[in-house]
Amino acid sequence: MNPNDRDLVRVRRYFNLDSIAGAGDEISKIKNLLAWVHNTIRHDGSSYNPEEKNAIALYEICKKEDRGVNCRMMAQMLNECYLAMGFKSRYVTCLPKSYINDCHVINVVYSNTLDKWLWVDPTWNAYVMDDKGNLLSISEVRDRLKKGEFVTVNEDANWNHKTPCT
């Protein structure tokens, strides 16, 4: 999607995303936008999905009703922020190995610098790395887990600023 799309321009201006992303390199912008969504909207997996599911509407209903949204809505919001800033981005539904009637939704964002899609999770403010601190894609995480190789998440990964995940 083109970042000059009028809806994405509106998102970029409404949230002042240029300021949030910062003036650093591409990776720092990706991390800054991830942290901002995580810090702005709290996760509440039991909340109902609002009728309007765009980033601005999600933000406004959460502020108005002092509520959170589920992981899918958080990923939707982050996806729109990335797209508005010119990053290629998608949200991805992750299913457990055994069916348990639940899922988790994360994002992948394309890094031109690293020439790959990166795993990012706004619910946990998390990104996944190898033992050298290199950011990983979903397929790299999967391959490393299958081989029993080291993976970790960033030290500040957490759920709603209450539960660290490291």
Predicted regions and their residues:
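Secondary-structure boundary elements
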Residues: M1-V69
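Sec-exported extracytoplasmic/periplasmic mature domains
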Residues: N16, A35-R42, L83-F87, S111-N112, ...
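Loop/turn elements at helix/coil->beta-strand transitions in domains of secreted/extracellular proteins
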Residues: E26-K31, L83-R90, N112-W117
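Active-site neighborhood of thiol-dependent amide/isopeptide-bond enzymes
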Residues: H43-I106
